[in-house]
Amino acid sequence: MEDLLVIGSKAKAAASELSHLVQTKKNEGLLACAKALIIHQKEILSANQLDIENAEKNQMKESLIDRLRLTTNRLEQMADGLRQIVSLKDPIGEVLSSEIRPNGLQILKRRVPIGVIGIIYESRPNVTSDAFGLCFKAGNAVVLRGGSDAIHSNLSIAKVLREALKETGINENAVQLLEDTSRETATKLMKLNEYIDVLIPRGGAGLIKSVVANSTIPVIETGTGNCHIYVDESADFKMALDIIDNAKTQRLGVCNACESLVIHENVLGEFLPQVYQRLTEKQVVFRADEKARAICPQMEEATEEDFATEYLDLLISVKVVKGIEEAIAHINHYNTGHSESIITSDYQNAMKFLEEIDAAAVYVNASTRFTDGEVFGLGAEIGISTQKLHARGPMGLEALTSTKYVVFGNGQIRP
């Protein structure tokens, strides 16, 4: 078993060095890592093939194997991701506020690195380079714990990244990957408060719940998305159909996909058959309440669990409401704080929805699929936070920083 105390100590030492690494040197390191991923693609793909073969032996679902699979094109995308991080503005050292107090003290608030970030994730090997790149640009060391399914791929990628950093004259312990993927080691990692400043879980609901329940280190939850679209009585039907189709079917396995429809009862008879036809053509299965099934009896009966479920599949739940108040109450009861949308022509209802829905991103007449760091102008993202502290919504570089007050005086003493 790996000595986590040694790993933590190395990470903390690396973080100290990274905290004052200039932007040009960080960018040099990132470009070296991007180049190395391409140069060493043969060995990375060979390692990935071992993971694919093991997954097939274990009869893993094809959709999950696809998430695990690396190709020449996907490696190029990973390298491009690191190059894009180079182009992002370095947040470290940014002065957020500056004030001269009546006593002559000049007080500045500056952006600084968090320190050491731990990331626990599942089967996507691209997270190894993506997470490293973002943490590194923000001046943080990172300790990675990937899933057992991708262990060969992750080890190969981490080895390449560490060698590239070392050749550039940067502490290779800026990125460390745990070789032991056991739950026991993961649980110990979650209690490494002395060395790790924050943990970020990336994966399904089970992983996130486990980290939140077991960690003694502060956790930023990157969330599951039980996202709703509310079709108000003044909704433009064509707009609603296009938005719902996009939000549900464009990409099933993402946290910003729509999982539940909430429909005003005054448009139920006209709108529900249209959306049913549109989505069933794409093999979507509906699970609906009694009022909706009275209009479309072909729909399956929805349970309480359905309304609380992030399907990530060709399934959608339907709830009929009497108006905006009931819609907001239903959504706030079942949502996961991710992304919620209203389709309406009523300005007052739109504003009420924006004010009263409790979520990281709230939309009027747009698809929930836009909740994404790149779309929001943040560049790459480490994840989408569904909590309110320390970050909320798509987390770019700034979310991987903290602040420090810097005070200049000329001999002041407190009276």
From Swiss-Prot:
Q: Where in the cell is it found?
A: Cytoplasm
Protein task? Catalyzes the NADPH-dependent reduction of L-glutamate 5-phosphate into L-glutamate 5-semialdehyde and phosphate. The product spontaneously undergoes cyclization to form 1-pyrroline-5-carboxylate.
- SUPFAM superfamilies, sorted: ALDH-like (SSF53720)
Q: Which UniProt keywords apply?
A: Amino-acid biosynthesis, Cytoplasm, NADP, Oxidoreductase, Proline biosynthesis
Listed PROSITE patterns: PROA (PS01223)
Q: Which InterPro entries match?
A: Ald_DH/histidinol_DH, Ald_DH_C, Ald_DH_N, Aldehyde_DH_dom, G-glutamylP_reductase_CS, Glu-5-SA_DH, GPR_dom
As recorded in UniProt, its EC number(s) are 1.2.1.41
Task: State what protein this is by name.
Answer: Gamma-glutamyl phosphate reductase
Q: Which GO terms describe its biological process?
A: L-proline biosynthetic process
Q: Which gene encodes it?
A: proA
Q: Which CDD domains did the record assign?
A: ALDH_F18-19_ProA-GPR
Molecular function (Gene Ontology), one example: glutamate-5-semialdehyde dehydrogenase activity
Q: Which family does it belong to?
A: Belongs to the gamma-glutamyl phosphate reductase family.
Q: Which organism is it from?
A: Lachnoclostridium phytofermentans (strain ATCC 700394 / DSM 18823 / ISDg)
**Origin, by domain of life?**
Bacteria
Gene Ontology CC annotations of this record: cytoplasm
What reaction does this catalyse? L-glutamate 5-semialdehyde + phosphate + NADP(+) = L-glutamyl 5-phosphate + NADPH + H(+)
Q: One Pfam family, please name it.
A: Aldedh
Biological or metabolic pathway of the protein: Amino-acid biosynthesis; L-proline biosynthesis; L-glutamate 5-semialdehyde from L-glutamate: step 2/2
